[in-house]
Amino acid sequence: MESQILNAIEIALDGSADQKLQVQAYEFLNEVKGSKSGYDTALKLLSSSPSNTLISQLKFFLYQVLEENAENLDPEDCLQLCQTLFKMLSEFIVNDLKDEAFLRNKLAQVFAKVFTQVYISTVPDFLTNLLATTQTNSQLALDYYTRILMSIHMEIGDKYITRSPALSERNMTLKDAIRSRDMSALVTSWFNILENTNNLDEVLDNTLNIIAQYVDWMEIGLFVSPQSINTIIGYLSRENERNSTCETLIHILLKKMPAQNKLELVSLLNLTNVISSIDLSDDLEFVERIAKLANQIGEELLIVLGNQPSLLDQVNEQLLKLWPIVLTFLGHEYDDVSQSVFPFIQQFLGACKKHSQLYSVELLSTLLNKTISKMEYDEEDDDSDEETERQFAEFRARLKLFQDGIASLVPDLYIEAVPIIINQSLFEGDKPWNKLELGMFELSNFSESLKNNVINAPKAKISESKPYLMFQEFLVKLINSPFIIKVNHPLIQSSFFELVVKHYSFLNSHENRKELVFKIIEIFTSPLGLLNSNDKVRLRSWYLFFRFMKLTKPKMDNEALIEDIVLKMQPLLVIKAELPTRDEDDDVVENGNFNNQQYLFETMGLLISLIPNEYVSLKVKLVQAMFQPIFNDLEKCISIANKEPIIVLQAHHSLMALGTIVRGYDYETNLKFPPEVVEKVDNAAQVVLITLENFSKSESVRDASRFAFARFIPILNSTIISGHLTKLITIIWSAPNLKISEISDFLSFLGQIAHTYRTDENIYQLLNNFLSPLFKKVFEVLDLPVTEDESLRPDISRDKNFLKKAILNFINAIIINHLPSLLVTESNKNELATVVSKLFEYAYDISDTAVSKLAIVQLINLVNVFGQEGKISDEQDKYGQSLPPVEGIDNFLMEKVVNLSFELPFRKQEFVLGDAQYRLIAQDIALLLKTFQQKKGEQFVEYLSVYLTNMGLGQDMTNDFCSNLINLDLKDYKKYFVTFVSQMKGEK
């Protein structure tokens, strides 16, 4: 069998082997692992073969077999395995057979598994026997000894491994047994190993790790005698063991104990003196470990204070020794070292709120200065990658918390120190870019601190306070500062633009508002902003310029300035579509800058709208200047016979640009549009329709056309747009490849039309003509049977649910915009029965609770509109009163509503009121019942009473239910109904 196993291992590890053969090899090896015969074979091979004759791969596999079977053996077999392992170990030691590290680790893991099975009763002297193997002073024996103990810890003591309650209980029993039998001998052996510094570095390192692992659940007194502590601390001076020594000391500090004892432990360790004497100039990893050790000292002292405030003086004494070390690490040139002491600093500032004796102004001043200096970029960080930028931003955010914490403790210190830093960084002589950037960053922080009132000033007086006036002065000086123009650095430029956009409200209220805003616009439209050579700054500034213009809305009455802006921006408005590609993960990657470019188009629309109407000729000129290149582009796309994907994408982008320009114009005050501008938008609408006709089979062009028209709607009056909309709807609706998601979006678009033109006769007639075909198409799509392929595609199911929501929202738009008469006109009344039927169908289907809830809301709407003798009750529907009542609809709704109200919560097993979604549906059902009762009065109550009685509800309960329906207000009735359902279903 040995040869079979070896052959299977070779095949499994051979990268060039036949895949089917490899699968067979893995299956065979797994069978060996899982069978008793495989275990017997493995044990026999290991025990009978000379220790140096088995090849490594085979030996590793045999160890795996033993490990996987160890917990399933009976006591006799387990004892045999234990004896065999010790015999093998003895042979290895005697023959000084040093296997590769991975084999020694695996054997140690086998020992650990066996230990958990035999130590309690079968082999109580397991650890004694293990310790005995080290008496020869063999380095190999010590190596195995330490590895086995570390593996035992992994099995029974590692807190980061999740275990079942049974295993946790077993491990507690094992630890109790170790404490009572072997703890003292084990700890003594570890310090004996450490006292002999001639032992192998690997053995010494393992031993330090063992102490770190076991101290958590062993008697602390065994570890903290002066001699023991000196032994451990001595290893801080040994290069190969010092990192592990730091971890060991941290674990000793973490040991849970009474506050007084912990304070004594910190004093005994005297680590502040030790750390102060260590050379921290060479090894960065070691410096980081020492910093974490210092941080842990601080955290433990604060825990002592939290648990026993009476120890404040002693804790403060220790903290005063610690602070110089912490401040040194905080100011370290490497951020990873600095971050190591962040937890202590954060907790310290929190503790200072309770114990003001912990700090002095001098300490906090030093801490504040160190914090601010760490916020500064290194001067050589000239072109950091995005990940580095993100990490530094997070680093700064944590430092800012310290800054704010200090500000809340000593506001005067903060108000005095930070403005000095800002002034020195920004306005005192020539400074390198990183100093200037720090000044802008601190200026932004300063404003945030004032906004969040970390200085605890009276809220009503913040805007009049000296710090706020200082901030205003700094910001104005910054806007007018020449260095913004002179210093060509991306971080300076992006920081400036972010800062001025963030503080737009200050600019809007400033006495020199116009001058400042125009100065900023000038900088935005210079090579520092929109035309920046740095992609990141340039693209970000496109968005920020749009935000700035939208938030400040300057009055654009300077024709020369406007033309200058347009002239600068025109090269950026050239649309050049680029097809997406796929990356190495096969994800679609968008190419080109069109998404960013849309901010420029929107800004241009906004800019034109900010020109006063007395300059209407300029407005028209600029609209034409924006539109005409796009019209030319679309004409070119249409003229190309071969509609390749790149041509379709170019047409899509051009249509989106038209819509986006108009969306920007939509921000004009009070939506008053000069007729000349309306005419230009009308021209754009015609161009969109011509393009759509020529690209009607393209989903992206249909989407872009709908997008554009959605933006035209607020500007074009109904007389102009009704004909356009008729054509748009006809083209899109007749497309042969219309997707479900498109229909959903289209319904949303129609809802917008219904809202915008709800009083317009032309649009009413347009919707009236289209409603029946719309309902038929939507319900036809939703009723299509699910094919086998669709059942494997959750996106189709998701799209259908979205379509249900879309049609329900469209019905809602019709009703809330006072157009319910559309449902019962001569053209559409035949579809009403189907619509109502679908509402009940969707209400019953709680596979998507959002759909069910929305359907019930529409039923409430229908009851409100038709619930009184079928006559439309909405007085604002100007066509409703001329239409005859819908005969029988109120009684039909009454019957179906009552059925729904009790069948849905009681017959659906999954309808559990503990789930918030179902609880909301129950509340909507209560509203549905209450609405009908208010509409039909006694007639509804009588029908409901008969229904409940027929369903088997007692007369008293029926009377109580009906009485509450009549007498309770809506809020209380919702509570009552939920309680009623819960009690009847036997839910808690």
From Swiss-Prot:
Its main location: nucleus. GO terms for cellular component: cytoplasm; nuclear matrix; nuclear pore. The keyword Protein biosynthesis does not apply. It is found in: Nucleus; Cytoplasm. InterPro entries: ARM-like, ARM-type_fold, Exportin-1/Importin-b-like, Exportin-T_C, XPOT. The keyword rRNA-binding does not apply. It holds the Pfam family Xpo1. GO terms for biological process: tRNA processing; tRNA re-export from nucleus. Keywords: Cytoplasm, Nucleus, RNA-binding, Transport, tRNA processing, tRNA-binding. Coiled coil: none annotated. GO terms for molecular function: small GTPase binding; tRNA binding. Belongs to the exportin family. tRNA nucleus export receptor which facilitates tRNA translocation across the nuclear pore complex. Involved in pre-tRNA splicing, probably by affecting the interaction of pre-tRNA with splicing endonuclease. This is Exportin-T. The lineage of its organism: Eukaryota, Fungi, Dikarya, Ascomycota, Saccharomycotina.
